[in-house]
Amino acid sequence: MIDAVEKTEGKQAVRVLLVDDHDLFRTGLRNLLEEQGLDIVGEASDGGQAVRMTRELAPDVVVMDLNMPGMTGVEATRQVTTAAPLTRVVVLTISDQDGDVLDAILAGACGYLLKDSSVDELIRGIVAAAVGESLVSPAIAGKVLQQVRATAISPEAADTIRAELSDRELDVLKLIAAGNDNAMIAAQLHISPKTVKNHISNILMKLQIENRIQAAVYAVRSGLV
């Protein structure tokens, strides 16, 4: 089991806001995550409350359900990532519908997990989000890529993307889209993890996107992978 307390290289435990309209599920999830060393700073039962509490509490990660009354999880994700750029959103839902997954990612979610995920997978997803990584449930990753490929951008737009990025940044982008984490990218390109992080920051800035999952979407749509 990943030690969530140690995830940030000696820093404090990951601060998490839970968002789900089912009280019993939230309580069980809270107990589970606290047992693993995560700091649950609050709970919200709908999207609007999630946005308000994010502004107040500035959690590291928001664990977000999609299907809630009132504001949807997708819209709440969009507002959370706009209001608090340093807060990461991990979607935790029963929905494996292609449209829901892609909508959540494009809204700014940096992780998408199903509620039947293992405890290890859930903890990995939250910890990964807290340090700027991403995790999509393996059960739906392939479906997402198929949908992304079906909405490929024009060759002209793809050429523009290639022109914006350096050769090394293109290499990093391809490896992100192939599912590699920072350490794996560093090893394959024979550069340091810190250099990988710098390249990723430049890629996100140049493409005007929020996270590495969106970067992977760009890579697939532009035909890089």
Regions inferred by a protein language model and the residue ranges of each:
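Receiver (REC) domain active-site loop signature in two-component systems and cognate sites
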Residues: M68
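Two-component/phosphorelay signaling modules centered on CheY-like receiver
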Residues: D23-G42
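Acidic catalytic/metal-coordinating carboxylates
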Residues: D46-Q49, T72-E75
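Active-site residues of response regulator receiver
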Residues: D65, T93
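Active-site beta3 strand of CheY-like receiver
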Residues: L57-V63
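Regulatory hinge/linker segments at domain boundaries
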Residues: Q146-L175
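Recognition helix of helix-turn-helix DNA-binding domains
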Residues: G179-Q214
